[in-house]
Swiss-Prot record:
This is DNA-directed RNA polymerase subunit omega. Its EC number is 2.7.7.6. The RNAP catalytic core consists of 2 alpha, 1 beta, 1 beta' and 1 omega subunit. When a sigma factor is associated with the core the holoenzyme is formed, which can initiate transcription. Belongs to the RNA polymerase subunit omega family. One of its GO terms (cellular component) is DNA-directed RNA polymerase complex. NCBIfam families: rpoZ. GO terms for molecular function: DNA binding; DNA-directed RNA polymerase activity. Promotes RNA polymerase assembly. Latches the N- and C-terminal regions of the beta' subunit thereby facilitating its interaction with the beta and alpha subunits. It comes from the Bacteria. GO terms for biological process: DNA-templated transcription.
């Protein structure tokens, strides 16, 4: 499994603070049982934070997570 770096994720969400908030929010969703948006085999061994970063790097999750969190 390839390592996910912050630089991979910053290509999708350029602001480090927004990236941190989005990854933390998505990791919390995953930990609470949300459906994974990437290959489920990869997520079975990884912690929710790593899965969230993989989703961001793959372009499956972006700033819209933060916008939804603010509205709710």
């Amino acid at each position: 499994m390839a390592r996910i770096t912050v630089d991979d994720c910053l290509k999708r969400i350029p602001n480090r603070f927004d990236l941190t908030l989005a990854a933390a929010y998505r990791a919390r969703q995953i930990a609470n049982g949300a459906q994974l948006l990437i290959d489920s085999n990869a997520g079975s061994k990884d912690k929710p934070t790593v899965v969230a970063l993989r989703e961001i790097a793959a372009g499956q999750i972006g700033r819209e997570v933060l916008e939804r969190a603010i509205r709710s």
